[in-house]
């Protein structure tokens, strides 16, 4: 497997990342469609949205919507992820996309929360359905101060009815703490390393 850091910067420099995204979306929708036809187990797919798409947000929305319709993908199987940094630099376009897909009952996630420059105060206004906590919050092996910060973030997110996802979960200690704090979903090497679609 190639990890994104090994090729995405090159594609972003050459402007090819846009074409790659549409290729990945179509491949993902085809994969879901085939699993549905075979009545195989399906779990929701999270798909990243590159910053470049927010320059032509109407084109992006309609291309992706057409692909969803083409493969007849039920809304509960899709999640679109937008990084916190992308949101900060494209608030109006991101909100336009969120409103469009939320009308179709497709979940939108803020990825890497805590890696950018938004404040906790930002959380009360965002339209996202879920917030994915950046793994750096867990990288210090959950010091007492780190736990307090996470508890406060979780408390605020729960009060604003956001789903909470934590990435970078690697130890049983992390799992126990996050389950105790009612984190909705956990991701990380504790469960699986990246797998091929097959």
Predicted regions and their residues:
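Structural preference for long, well-ordered alpha-helical segments in enzyme cores
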Residues: 10-11, 24-32, 63-64, 97, ...
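EAL-family c-di-GMP phosphodiesterase catalytic domain
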Residues: 33-35, 50-55, 77-91, 106-198
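Short helix-loop capping/hinge motifs at secondary-structure junctions, enriched
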Residues: 1-2, 34
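Catalytic-core regions built around general acid/base machinery
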Residues: 63-70, 96-104, 148, 152
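Catalytic core of bacterial c-di-GMP phosphodiesterases, primarily the EAL and HD-GYP domains
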Residues: 16-93, 168
């Amino acid at each position: 497997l190639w990890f994104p850091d090994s090729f995405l910067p090159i594609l972003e420099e050459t402007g090819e990342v846009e074409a790659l995204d549409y290729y990945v979306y179509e491949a993902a929708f085809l994969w879901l469609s085939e699993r549905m036809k075979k009545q195989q187990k399906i779990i929701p797919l999270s798909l990243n949205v590159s910053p470049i798409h927010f320059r032509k947000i109407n084109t992006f929305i309609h291309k992706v919507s057409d692909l969803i319709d083409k493969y007849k993908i039920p809304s509960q199987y899709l999640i679109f992820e937008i990084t916190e940094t992308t949101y900060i630099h494209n608030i109006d376009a991101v909100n336009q996309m969120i409103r469009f897909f939320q009308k179709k009952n497709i979940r939108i996630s803020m990825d890497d929360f805590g890696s950018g420059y938004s404040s906790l105060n930002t959380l009360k206004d965002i339209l996202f359905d879920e917030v994915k906590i950046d793994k750096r919050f867990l990288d210090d092996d959950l010091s007492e101060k780190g736990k307090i910060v996470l508890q406060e973030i979780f408390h605020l997110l729960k009060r604003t009815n956001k789903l909470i996802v934590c990435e970078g979960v690697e130890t049983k200690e992390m799992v126990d703490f996050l389950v105790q704090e009612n984190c909705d979903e956990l991701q990380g090497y504790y469960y699986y390393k990246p797998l091929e679609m097959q």
